[in-house]
Each structure stands twice: as C-alpha cells, then as structure tokens.
Amino acid sequence: MEKTETSPEMRLFGPGGERLYLTALERQRFLAALDEEHPMDRLYCHVLHYSGCRPSEALELVPRRVLFEEQALVFRSLKKRKTDARGRTKQPQYRTVPVPNILIENLDLVYGIRALQKKQKGLDIPLWTMSRPTAYRLVKRVMDRAGIVGKQATGKGLRHGFGVAMVTAKKPLPLHVLAQMMGHTDTKTTEIYLQVVGEEKRQMVSDAWEG
C-alpha cells in the first residue's frame, strides 16, 4: 500500500501533538527579545513577524519591492510548482503583503530605500546577505533569549503564529485574503489555522458568544 506523505507546511501540530506555531504571548516575547540584535537583524525578524513570509522569502527582499504608498512588501512566492500541467516553465509568482507603516519606515531608515528608489540604483540587491543557515541561527538565538522552547521556536513557527493570529483576531481576516498574503494556492491549506487550541480557541469562542 502506498504511503501518503504530508507536507510540513500543512501541519500545526507534530506527530506527537506538539504545537508548531507561536502563541500570541510567545510572539510578543519574540519581539521584546530583539532589542539586543543588530538593527539589520532586528528588521529581518520584524519582517518575518509582521508579514508571515517564509524565511527564505524574506532573504530575497530587495529595495524595489518595498512599497511606500501601499505600506506593503512584495515577496516572490516560493514552494510553487515551477512547471504547469504541460511541463511548461511558469513565470515567478509574487504577492503583496500589507505591513505596519513603522516597519516600512524602519527599513528606509536603515537601508535608505527611498533614496535608492529615487536614484534607481541598487534596487535588486537583497537587503540581507546572510545565508539561510545564518538566518535560522538568528531566529533560534532570539527564541532562546525569549525563553521560547519547543518545535515552534523556528521561522516556520513564526509563520504559523502569524496565520493563527490573523484568524483569531477580533476581526478575523477572511481566509481567501490570508491565503493570498501567505502565498497559498488553495484556501484549504489556509484552513489549518482554524485548528487552534488554548487561549486562541477560547478567544474565538468568547467572541462568538459576544456576537
């Protein structure tokens, strides 16, 4: 009998039931633990936190994809099929993700993005030159400092925590909007964020009672 494999991206819990996403409190602690990091490293972690992007997608971010008027970042969506059903090469897919204005302003403060865009120079040079392993160690270091221990203490845990936060907010983000923001092809993938437990689920039930 053929064994069915499940993509890690599709799970909020490990094989033993361990949580793979950050709770609201853990997300707050992660942000608070960033104070000791270099401004550039701090911004990398802020991008992960506020956009829900994949760590490797953040590493590809370039000045051209920082949108000031829209207060958004543009990411190339990874984990997409590179060929269509007929084997033809597909064009890269991008998505726009709204982020807090303070993040846009801090990116400009550290990298001088407005000036680069005005001069039309260096627009396609990645903001971060660190490797994926270095980025992984950065996130792990901040998690350790924040006292976050477990399989959720990763960049993917941050991404899942973002998804959970969006569906457990007082005004939950519609799944089709969240799917676009996270680069999901199908909203069925995004529905995993409804499988929340603990305080997040209690908050959803409480909101439903109040409604």
Feature annotation, model-predicted:
Residues 27, 100-150:
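Active-site/catalytic core of tyrosine-dependent DNA strand-transfer enzymes
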Residues 3-28, 83-102:
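DNA breakage-rejoining catalytic core of tyrosine-based enzymes
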Residues 20, 24-55:
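Basic, Lys/Arg- and aromatic-enriched nucleic-acid-binding interface segment
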Residues 159, 206-211:
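Short, basic, alpha-helical segments at the C-terminal edge of helix-turn-helix-like DNA-binding modules
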Residues 34-37, 118-123, 137-180:
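Short, basic (Lys/Arg/His-rich) helix/loop patches that form interaction surfaces
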Residues 79-81, 182-207:
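Catalytic-site neighborhood detector that most strongly recognizes the C-terminal catalytic loop/helix
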Residues 37, 47-60, 169-173, 184:
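A short, glycine-centered helix-capping/turn motif at helix boundaries
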Residues 60-109:
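Conserved tyrosine-mediated DNA breakage-rejoining catalytic core shared by Y-recombinases
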